[in-house]
Amino acid sequence: MRSNVGVWKSLFMKEEFVGDNENPSTYLVEALAHCSECHTPRNMFGAMKTKQWMRGASNPSGKGKIPSIHPDDLKWTKEEIAEYLSSGLTPNYDVAGGNMALVVENLSKLSKEDLLLIASYIKNVK
């Protein structure tokens, strides 16, 4: 089994790591908040489909779908995204539920500046 992990890593793990001069929004989203872990679909081996970055995925519980937060689909402003991440309220006054409620609980402790950096990253996903 352990040798299979090495094969998986060689196929799917990025070799580059976040460096000292990395863009702070990239660091916040990809390293700390790890938004893509839920919002990016996976292949049959459990690796993220990077060509569908942040385009939504099946819910691991088997019920429903994790929504796309790709800018083609999520039409919120940066300020609305930052507000959602700090309060859990959508622009339509819906509330974050499930695991996202836990994410909001943790992200709400970040500064407004950091939340806007996360929102900026999300608005600029290609």
Model-found features: residue ranges?
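Protein kinase-like catalytic domain
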Residues: V29, H39, S86-L89, K126
